[in-house]
Regions:
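Rhodanese-like catalytic fold shared by cysteine-dependent sulfurtransferases
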Residues: 1-33, 41-82, 93-140
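Conserved G/P- and acidic residue-centered "switch" motifs that form tight phosphate/ATP-binding loops
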Residues: 37, 90
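Short, surface-exposed ligand- or partner-binding patches at beta-edge/loop junctions that are enriched
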Residues: 85-86
Length: 140
């Protein structure tokens, strides 16, 4: 990791660190990292996704049961690069980053997630998040 990159990493316990959506996008665009979106297939379909991200759900819908194929999927997606993990608001991706680290990967959590925290009215997408920050995303 370059000195410039390390200044953008917030220390974390159990994984390589937390990074902003903009840092994750820069690393992904430069080929330095692979983005793994750990949201469910339903979330990707209904809410939107990041082009180029690899979908490896941490939990599965319905019921949000653990994905038994997570370990295999995240290792295959990494391709020898560091991984940046994205979820809805930056919570599931912490657990996924810890697991990826246990598997021997250099794993980072993307702060704020795809949608960010809910605002005072309970709506997401207005208080932080990949989408609100104007970074690349699509919706089917």
């Amino acid at each position: 990791m370059s000195a410039h990159s390390s200044s953008q990493v917030h220390p974390a316990d159990g994984y390589a660190g937390d990074i902003t959506p903009h840092t994750a996008n820069a690393w992904m665009q430069s080929g330095e990292a692979v983005m793994i979106d750990v949201r469910s297939e339903a979330e990707l379909a209904w809410v939107g996704f990041v082009p180029g991200a690899v979908a490896v759900p941490w939990k599965q819908w319905p019921g949000m049961a653990m994905n038994p194929a997570f370990d295999e999927g995240v290792k295959a997606a990494a391709q020898g690069k560091k991984v940046v993990l994205l979820c809805r608001s930056g919570v599931r991706s912490i657990a996924a980053a810890k697991r990826a680290t246990e598997l021997g990967l250099e794993a980072y959590n993307i702060l704020e997630g795809f949608e960010g925290d809910a605002n005072a009215d309970g709506h997401r997408g207005t208080v932080g998040g990949w989408r609100m920050r104007g970074l690349p995303w699509r919706q089917n």
